Regions:
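Alpha-helical protein-protein interaction modules
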Residues: 93, 97, 103-121, 136, ...
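The tetratricopeptide repeat
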Residues: 8, 39, 75-79, 121-125, ...
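Structural register within alpha-helical repeat arrays
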Residues: 12, 43, 79, 83, ...
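TPR-adjacent "capping" and linker segments in tetratricopeptide-repeat scaffold/adaptor proteins
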Residues: 1-7, 28-35, 162-168, 195-197
Length: 272
C-alpha cells in the first residue's frame, strides 16, 4: 500500500473545512470513489471536534487497515488516540480493543523484524493504547511529571548562563524553554505572556499549559490551547488534518476536548 497524493482540488476543499465551512463536507462526495479513506479521515476529524463520538469511532474503525495511505505515522497515532478516548466515553471499548490487536497483527505480518525489535512506532503505540483501554493507563508525560526545581533560577541568571540575546526571537524562545526546565512556573508563564505573539512551536505552548495547569489556572490553560489551535501548527502532516487531532495526544487537554463550552472556544480559534 502506497501513500496517496491528493490533488489540489481536494486539498482546497480540506482547507475550506479547516476554516469552518461545514457546507464543504458535501464536496467530498465527488471524491468518494477515488479517495474513500481520506474522506473518512476528514469526516472523523470534524466529528471528534463536534463530540459526535459514535460516528467518529465508526469512521476511524473503518480507517484502521489503511494508515499506510498517509505519508506520516503521526496521522494514525493521533486518530487512534482520539478513537480510544471517544470509545471510552460511549462504551465501545469492545470494538476498539480487537481493532488495535488486528492492527498489531497486520504490522507484525508486514514488518515482523521491526515489530520484534521495538522499532515499529505504530505497533508500539498500539501497545500504549491497549494499556489505556484495558487499564486506563497512559505513559507519564511532561504534564504529570512536572515539578519545578527546588531552587529555581531567574530569567536574568539564565540569560547570563546561556549568553542569550533577549532581543533575538530564537534566544527568547530558548529562554522560555530554560525557564520551564530551570525556573519557576510563575516566571515561565509570565515570560510566555510576553513572547506569545512570536511564531512559537508546539513545545512552548505545551510548556505554558503545563505551568498554568500546575498553578491551577485552568482558564489560562484554555487560552493557551486556543492560541495553539489558531496557530495551525497541527495541520502539517496531511491536508486531511482539518482539525487538531494531535490535541488528543495530550491527556491534559482531554477535559477541554470533552466539555462543550471549551470545545466551542477551541473550534472558534481554529476557524479564527
Amino acid at each position: 500500500m502506497e501513500a496517496i497524493k491528493l490533488p489540489k482540488k481536494y486539498r482546497d476543499i480540506c482547507e475550506e473545512i479547516k476554516n469552518g465551512s461545514s457546507e464543504s463536507l458535501a464536496k467530498l462526495d465527488a471524491f468518494e470513489e477515488k479517495f474513500p479513506h481520506q474522506n473518512l479521515a476528514v469526516k472523523a476529524g470534524v466529528e471528534f471536534f463536534e463530540r459526535q463520538y459514535e460516528e467518529a469511532v465508526s469512521h476511524t474503525l473503518l480507517l484502521m487497515p489503511f494508515w499506510d495511505e498517509w505519508y506520516y505515522s503521526n496521522v494514525a497515532n493521533e486518530y487512534m488516540m482520539a478513537m480510544c478516548f471517544a470509545a471510552k466515553k460511549i462504551g465501545r471499548e469492545a470494538e476498539v480493543i480487537p481493532a488495535l490487536h488486528e492492527e498489531q497483527s497486520r504490522l507484525m505480518e508486514a514488518e515482523e523484524e521491526k515489530c520484534l525489535k521495538g522499532s515499529c512506532q505504530r505497533y508500539n503505540y498500539c501497545k500504549i493504547l491497549l494499556n489505556y483501554m484495558l487499564q486506563n493507563i497512559l505513559p507519564e508525560l511532561r504534564a504529570t511529571d512536572y515539578q519545578p526545581p527546588k531552587a529555581p533560577k531567574t530569567a536574568s541568571e539564565l540569560i547570563a548562563e546561556g549568553k542569550l540575546n533577549p532581543e533575538k526571537d530564537f534566544d527568547r524562545m530558548k529562554l522560555l524553554n530554560l525557564l520551564f526546565m530551570k525556573g519557576s512556573p510563575e516566571d515561565t508563564v509570565d515570560y510566555y505572556e510576553r513572547i506569545k505573539d512570536l511564531n512559537l512551536g508546539e513545545l512552548y505552548y505545551e510548556q505554558a499549559c503545563i505551568c498554568y495547569g500546575y498553578l491551577g489556572q485552568k482558564d489560562k490553560v484554555l487560552e493557551v490551547i486556543e492560541r495553539w489551535a489558531k496557530s495551525k501548527l497541527w495541520d502539517v502532516a496531511s491536508p486531511t488534518q482539518v482539525r487538531p487531532m494531535s490535541f488528543f495526544m495530550y491527556p491534559f487537554m482531554h477535559e477541554y476536548l470533552e466539555n462543550e463550552d471549551s470545545l466551542k472556544r477551541i473550534r472558534e480559534a481554529i476557524f479564527g
